[in-house]
């Protein structure tokens, strides 16, 4: 398997994506933002369409659209009751723009549509370096804001009482989430991002009672899904996304049964 450069690239990129999605997923689940992570991944497709229309690298368009939309959502959804409406409004706007740019672009648009499904087997060494750099940036943000993020995600009222600037923390978190989604979507696809951001972390809630324990389990679960999915995709020539999604679902239901039988 590792004698081929494309598989080496796939495993390296997949490993970093699994790590950042596993860690970010714990906060996504803790903040009840699974729907937002799904919408950001689709907005990434719109950003790729815009980038291609402008003659930019698709990643630049993805970063622009996801970061701007996450900041707008953060500003509009200060109250939790407004969050879903804000997410729906902003995502509808950006998805509409993406479809428009895809329709009027005279350039190669196949890459933009590939963003929906990903092409982890076809990733280049340059894209591996992009994933590596952006993943490190996202993890550094998480590391330096670990205490505030943990407090705000799992005890929002307590964080406000303690004087933590919860609005600022939320916006920074959304920007880091946008960065993570843009990094991973170009490799594993927008549709699979939702799986890696939610299922490992959701399973971790059933087997661990601490945030650090949830992160460890979520990262391991994401790594198992990506590594095993890549191998099975290689030997069967079936879509890697199918195997990763199936494995993560199996881990989730296994954790659910474990929790019920305790």
What positions do the PLM features span?
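Membrane-interface capping segments at transmembrane-helix boundaries
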Residues: 147-148, 257-262
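Membrane-interfacial amphipathic/re-entrant helices at transmembrane-helix boundaries
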Residues: 1-19
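Small-residue-rich segments of transmembrane alpha-helices in multi-pass membrane proteins
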Residues: 43-53, 90-102, 122, 166-176, ...
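Transmembrane helix-bundle core of multi-pass membrane transporters
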Residues: 5-9, 80, 87-145
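Short loop segments and helix-boundary regions at transmembrane helix junctions
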Residues: 26-108, 204-216, 233-235, 261
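Membrane-helix/interface signature in polytopic inner-membrane proteins
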Residues: 140-173
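Loop-to-transmembrane alpha-helix initiation sites
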Residues: 10-13, 58-66, 84-88, 132, ...
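Transmembrane alpha-helical segments in multi-pass inner-membrane proteins
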Residues: 193-242
